[in-house]
């Protein structure tokens, strides 16, 4: 889909909702995998499709494993940040920009809390805290742009979580 179509009023919500969906996918898998490793849920033949390795069930995450979770979170970040950029270039106003910043902020927060290193859009390898710094700015932007209490509350909830981690 070409960018010119993504910024049309009828497409904006779909773009933002796409970021939300990918983030929901990432959070679900990160939570599930973390619960297995922490023994918050007990394995019961969960190997193979949608399962976890015996090593993970025993509490060990192999380096380089579970890249799908990372991919989901990166896609959420990329989609939301692309929306922010496209909306800025088209001078889109209103709560849709606040929503894009909220989902970008939460995607960056998830990345910063779960991965020690960061690569943003093919750039250099950086400290994972870069995700949290980006999230802080995105939450602040959402607070400034939001016209509803629910959006401001979502941004106000995310920003101190990021600041506490930093």
Q: Which sequence ranges carry the predicted segments?
A:
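Membrane-proximal, proline-rich intrinsically disordered regions
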Residues: 1-38
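Conserved, well-structured interaction surfaces
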Residues: 13, 49-118, 127, 141-149
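N-terminal carbohydrate-binding/catalytic regions of secreted carbohydrate-active enzymes
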Residues: 26-52, 65-70
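Flexible, glycine-rich active-site loops centered on histidine and acidic residues
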Residues: 120-122
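Aromatic- and glycine-enriched pocket-lining scaffold segments that form the walls
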Residues: 150-166
């Amino acid at each position: 889909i070409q960018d010119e179509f993504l910024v049309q009023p009828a497409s904006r919500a779909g773009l933002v909702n796409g970021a939300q969906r990918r983030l929901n996918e990432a959070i679900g898998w990160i939570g599930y995998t973390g619960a297995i490793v922490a023994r918050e849920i007990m394995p019961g033949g969960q190997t193979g499709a949608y399962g976890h390795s015996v090593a993970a069930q025993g509490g060990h995450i192999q380096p380089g494993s579970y890249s799908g979770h990372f991919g989901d979170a990166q896609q959420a970040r990329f989609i939301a940040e692309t929306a922010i950029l496209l909306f800025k270039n088209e001078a889109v106003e209103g709560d849709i920009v606040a929503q894009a910043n909220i989902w970008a902020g939460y995607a960056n927060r998830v990345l910063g809390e779960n991965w020690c290193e960061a690569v943003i859009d093919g750039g250099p390898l950086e400290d994972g805290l870069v995700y949290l710094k980006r999230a802080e700015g995105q939450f602040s932007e959402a607070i400034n742009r939001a016209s509803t209490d629910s959006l401001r509350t979502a941004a106000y909830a995310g920003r101190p979580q990021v600041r506490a981690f930093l």
